[in-house]
Amino acid sequence: MTFAALSLLFAMTSADAVAVLLNSPGASSVRTFEVARETVEREAAKGKPLQQFVIGVTTDDKALAKKYMDSSRERIRFLAAHKDNPLAWYLLSLESNDLKLLRRAAAGNNVQALNALGTLVIREAFDKKNGVSTNDLEVILKKSFDCFSRAAAQRDPNGFINLGTCYLRGFGCEQDLAMAFECFKSAAEAGHPEGMDNVSACYQFGHGVAPDAELSLFWGMRGRAARGDEAAAKWLRERK
């Protein structure tokens, strides 16, 4: 492990690591995701139920998933049923693919549930677009916008990406390119590679911000470096 990765490991809290792992690899840099997984795996191996269940729903190792989920399921169910823990509701919704549990988690402001529910609603809206009136479509899209707004209000990178996309396209709100740019920039500054790409595109095409070829290149390189592109990382180091 490099010194930089070691520093990141000590800086990352358990809650941060769980959030990174549940937000999927594309929502953070390759290094951040790897460190988050190592952090959660280490705590799961110590017998911590929450971390065990998180590994269970995110690993490709079916045997390990069964072992950890069988070991921790009772505790997660207790946290959901008796503590009304939003993260516990979300984890149970992942295991059973249960929309009711997902809504319960979103009602408790779990950011992963808010993003998932908002995305699900918006997809269904467009799947049914031909059979939905314009007014009904606007109401449906507003529900997605509200979900993403609540996630972004908690400084969640995926929430910023989703909210920025709503502003960019006018989904559930008036189109506002300046707000879209600010959302994408917030995601980028939080380390989201897609946010970096979007900021680069905004500077390239002048969406919500004055065109700037140099800044477009800079953010594009940051997005590539975050995904593990060594040439881009070298370019950024030499630019300092």
Regions found by a protein language model. Give the residues of each.
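Alpha-helical tetratricopeptide repeat
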Residues: V18-L22, R37, P49-F53, P86-Y90, ...
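Structural signature of tandem alpha-helical TPR/SEL1-like repeats
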Residues: T32-E34, D61-E74, L94-L101, D127-C147, ...
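Fold-core signature of tandem repeat domains
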Residues: A44, A106, L117, A152, ...
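Hydrophobic face of amphipathic alpha-helices that form TPR/SEL1-like repeat modules
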Residues: V54-D61, L91-S96, A116-N130, N162-R169, ...
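Canonical positions in the second alpha-helix
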Residues: E43, F78-L79, R104-A105, R150-A151, ...
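Short helix-capping/linker turns of helical repeat alpha-solenoids
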Residues: K46-K48, D60-K62, K83-P86, G108-Q112, ...
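N-terminal leader/linker segments that initiate helical-solenoid repeat arrays
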Residues: L8-K67
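Terminal, low-structured helical/coil segments at or just beyond the last alpha-helical repeat
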Residues: L217-K240
